Amino acid sequence: MPSVVTHKFRQNNADQFKEAFGEAAPTRMYMFIGGVKAWTNDASPPTPNDAVANTVYAHWRDMLSCKKVEASDVSYVIPRVNWTSGTLYTEYSDTNSTLFSNTFYAMVSDYHVYKCLFNNNGGLSTSTPSGTSSSIITTADGYKWKYMYTVSAADVLKYNTASYIPVKTLSANDGSNQWSVQQAAVNGSIDIVDVTAGGSTYNNYHTGTLAAVGNTTTVTLASGASAVNDLYNGSMFYTTGGTGLGQQKEVINYVGSTRVATLASAVSTGLDGTTTYSVAPKVVLQGDGTGATAIATMNTTSNTVYSMTVTAVGQDYSQANVVISANGSSGVTATAYIAPKTGHGKDAVAELGGFNVMVNCKFDKDEGGKFTTSNDFRKIGLLRDPLLASGTAANGATYDQTTTFGLNAVSGTFVTDERVDGGTTTSNAYIVQANSSQIKVTSQDGLFAAGETVTGNTSLATANVLTHTIG
């Protein structure tokens, strides 16, 4: 039976991992380093695998030190996409099953991140999006973008890489533009209506400045309007400028000889000779939400519908159909893109595909003597809820996972990374640090006996084991 791992499932996995660091009774995670032994070819290390021999045994033997990972060391991240001129960005669509595999957002040079809502019918992006407005940002190339958030300077330093950028959703007002965007988001809004077919023979449109206003339901169109009776019946009259901007009314009667259009209902704000208008096909957004409206923009050369402008985004839609009608015209189709359930910009992590989590745990010099600074390491990993030798849960800031041998009767000089062999037990280990009185070892195989002689495999130095201390 076909199945799919949904983006919501992937997001849940990331949420659970990240939340583990900040819960009331948090999972204790430690970042460890290990592996002083050289690989067969250090320039081409082996691919890690999940064998029991590695995850249960070898990594522990090779471990040098570990440091507790705090909640402040963890961030959601998304693939880094730098805005680049000449790129076709994928526009957001609630029906696009491969959205998160596409380039549908971009970060600009000042670390603002924008989501592409409309790509100008498949055009190339040539104008850099800018600004932090909560409203849709339209650029000169016809693209429409949604400002999502800005990567802070601190997060740039800690989590920004060539491949990933950090992303977060705010839970409290931090005074940022992102918080304003989150608060302005509208559940189930329709921000974009995309024309999929422009139709044909749309001659019943007109733009101009009103010649006269009769009353609240009658207007006289400009001199270039049609002389054909009823031509604009069923179309939408929309005020585009001047007095009474932004009103939409259906034309129910048109007299060609006088150019008088009768509107289905009264305008709420009086119109006058400064009012500019557009008469175009009527657009109705039918769905389970309320309040969304849109108007059509015409291609006056081909007499087709070129695009739609959403004049009110509405709310609470989960599905919607676009119905377009005008007297004597046909063939136009369009799709309404419904925002995520909480609205564009409400949850940047979920909306941009924050399925990955980055851990950045800084090792500060020798961490009070718990970490070596005189050797290298070849392994790095995470420990979940490690236990101390006593059986209690580890909760300290750092731990030293090496064993220190106190020596006497030293002859010669031990060197780091060499194998040291026991003369009695045939045990062996690898030296992390060495001086004239002690050696610190890891990757121990077998138990050394007190008093036995150990020999460096490379230096041939010898000494007797006087004491041994774990950690």
Regions picked out by a protein language model, each given a short descriptive name:
Residues M1-V113, L117-G471:
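Feature for peripheral, non-core segments
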